[in-house]
Every structure is written in structure tokens, then in C-alpha cells.
């Protein structure tokens, strides 16, 4: 709904309003692979209480005394392996920007909708893009955390950051948060089609298809986080859609950090065990990642593949994320159009 300009007094200042914003938000990325950029990014990420729930007195001495002195260099080297050299940025940034631009094109039938993108950690920040959308006249914003499965450490922290920005705004836009879509039919179909397309390009058939999701500490799950259950359901629906059995499909969890027990089975240990048990050919897909990033391109496509081959495996395939593909954009567009109902 657009305000009737004719009703404004003659001396009324120019004010843009009546538009609806769509803000796509992913996890984040460092600005570069150098030590300073990596440390700045890791500090913002690892001081988030949604990510690390330890008490500050316990966690900060470890973080500032050890982690932020050692890990920036190590993680920076990993990023260098998968850095988008052409654009001098991470592929996560490239894909998220592309998704935003493609979404704007797909929604061009809606005159009053503006699409933008942000990162929870790093740049562009959520706060800066909410401010920009408001300045463009968006008095309503659909906040879309790009996570098919809900977790407090991902979706909730995006919502936290957005609402924290509203605390500083005199004229707040209405904010609508997008729920998870872990069992959405279009999403499951897109994953299945991606698997079928990629495997059809190989001259071999995998003995096992692994759906590897980012892990979270087991304690988070026990406190009520629905993430594990949603990952399992996504995996089951994908397996059924592909017509596979539990003997040739499994769900695993990757990227654990620190000494705590995380969701299991662990992807790295599973890949190693499968190879040692005589499984020769496997394929891995990452259904929980909307875009390829460090955890998929380096941790799975490089590290997991190397481990599999080192322990006796012969053939390893990593199935790309949906990224900015046509099928991937259909999923995102469906979710956005659903959440725009009543506003456009």
C-alpha cells in the first residue's frame, strides 16, 4: 500500500515509502584470506553467543588466547584453495549476490518489491542493508535466512541481528521472518534432480550416497533445537524421492569444532570407515547449504575426498549445492513469494 501523496501538506519533506524489501542472508565470509581479515571475521563469528554457548569467562580466554592467534592463518590457507580468484572473493559471496540479482529479476512483476542481500558475519552487514532498504522506501521487509533447516546458531542469530538493528530505528519497518523449508516438495525435488544430473555425468555408480549436514553440539539438540530432526527428515525425503534404501544412503554431520560431542555420525569418520570397510565408490551432497562455501568446497570436495582415497576408496564425487542454478532459484522464489502474501 502506497501513501496518498496528495494528502501531504505542501511543505512535507520527501519520504519514500510503500515498498516491500526482501533481504537474503547467509552466514558470512571474510573480506580476504590474509591474517587480519580472517581474524576479524572469526572474532565476530566466534563471539556470537548463539554459536558458542559457553560462559564468557570460560570461552574468551581460549578464544582470545589461543583460537584467534592460531586459526586465522590455518583457515586463511583453506580459503585460498577455494577462493574465487576472478572476483577476489569467496564463492559464498559470489553466489549470494547472484541469488539476490536473479531473485530481483524473477520478481520484476511485483513493482513495489526490492531485493537485497547481507551476511550475518562480515559485509555487507544485516544492519546496513535493513537501513538501505528503509531508505529506499521499504516499510515492510521479508527477512530470509538462507538455511533450509532451522538452528539457533544459524536462523535465530540472523533474526537476533535484524531485530537488534530495529532497536536503533525511529521509524521501524515491519519485519517478517521466513521459517525453515526442510520438507518443502520443491526443495526436495531440486536436491533429487541435482543428484540425478550429477551422477548421470559419471561413468560409475556410487555404492553409497551421503547427505552431509553442518553439525551442532549435541547439547544444543538436547536443549530443544529442532535441527537434527529436520536434517533427518530432509535426508529421508531425499532418499525416498531417489528410490534409495538405507543400505545405500545415510545422513552425517560435519564441521565439528572444539571438544564437545556433536551430532553424529561424523562425516569425516564415516567416509574413512566406509573406505576401510571396502566401499569403493561414494558420492556426497550437502543439502543444508544453499551455496557452496568453505565447508563444501574444501572440507568435503578436498579433505573428505583425500581421506576416502587414502583409506582405500577409489571413486569420490561431490555434488554441488543448488547455488544460483535454475532449480535452486525456483526453491528460493517459491519461499519468497509465499512469504510475500498479504504484502503485495
From Swiss-Prot:
UniProt entry keywords in alphabetical sequence: Cytoplasm, Heme biosynthesis, Iron, Lyase, Metal-binding, Porphyrin biosynthesis
Pathway linked to the protein: Porphyrin-containing compound metabolism; protoheme biosynthesis; protoheme from protoporphyrin-IX: step 1/1
A Pfam family assignment: Ferrochelatase
Biological process according to GO: heme biosynthetic process
Keyword Phosphoprotein attached: no
Intracellular or extracellular location(s): Cytoplasm
Protein name: Ferrochelatase
The organism of origin for this protein: Rhizobium etli (strain CIAT 652)
Gene: hemH
Amino acid at each position: 500500500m502506497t501513501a496518498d501523496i496528495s494528502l501531504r501538506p505542501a511543505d512535507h519533506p520527501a519520504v519514500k515509502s510503500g515498498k516491500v524489501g526482501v533481504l537474503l542472508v547467509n552466514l558470512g565470509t571474510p573480506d580476504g584470506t590474509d591474517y587480519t581479515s580472517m581474524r576479524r571475521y572469526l572474532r565476530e563469528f566466534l563471539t556470537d553467543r548463539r554459536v558458542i554457548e559457553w560462559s564468557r569467562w570460560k570461552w574468551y580466554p581460549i578464544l582470545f588466547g589461543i583460537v584467534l592467534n592460531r586459526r586465522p592463518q590455518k583457515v586463511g590457507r583453506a580459503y585460498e584453495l577455494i577462493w574465487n580468484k576472478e572476483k577476489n572473493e569467496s564463492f559464498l559471496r559470489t553466489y549470494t549476490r547472484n541469488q539476490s540479482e536473479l531473485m530481483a529479476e524473477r520478481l520484476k512483476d511485483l513493482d513495489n518489491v526490492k531485493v537485497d542481500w547481507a551476511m550475518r558475519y562480515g559485509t555487507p552487514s544485516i544492519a546496513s542493508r535493513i537501513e538501505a532498504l528503509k531508505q529506499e522506501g521499504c516499510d515492510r521487509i521479508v527477512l530470509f535466512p538462507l538455511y533450509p533447516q532451522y538452528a539457533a546458531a544459524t536462523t535465530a542469530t540472523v533474526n537476533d541481528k535484524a531485530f537488534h538493528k530495529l532497536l536503533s530505528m525511529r521509524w521501524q519497518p515491519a519485519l517478517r521472518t521466513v521459517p525453515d523449508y526442510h520438507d518443502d516438495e520443491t526443495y526436495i525435488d531440486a536436491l533429487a534432480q541435482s543428484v540425478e544430473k550429477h551422477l548421470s555425468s559419471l561413468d560409475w555408480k556410487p555404492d553409497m550416497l551421503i547427505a552431509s549436514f553442518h553439525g551442532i553440539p549435541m547439547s544444543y539438540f538436547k536443549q530443544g533445537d529442532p535441527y537434527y530432526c529436520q536434517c533427518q527428515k530432509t535426508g529421508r525425503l531425499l532418499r525416498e524421492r531417489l528410490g534409495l534404501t538405507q543400505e545405500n544412503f545415510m545422513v552425517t554431520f560435519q564441521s565439528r569444532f572444539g571438544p564437545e560431542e556433536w551430532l553424529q555420525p561424523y562425516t569425516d569418520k564415516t567416509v574413512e570407515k566406509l573406505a576401510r570397510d571396502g566401499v569403493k565408490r561414494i558420492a556426497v551432497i550437502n543439502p543444508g547449504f544453499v551455496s557452496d562455501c568453505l565447508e563444501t568446497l574444501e572440507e568435503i570436495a578436498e579433505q573428505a575426498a583425500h581421506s576416502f582415497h587414502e583409506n582405500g576408496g577409489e571413486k569420490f564425487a561431490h555434488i554441488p549445492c543448488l547455488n544460483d542454478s535454475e532449480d535452486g532459484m525456483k526453491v528460493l522464489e517459491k519461499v519468497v513469494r509465499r512469504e510475500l502474501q498479504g504484502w503485495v
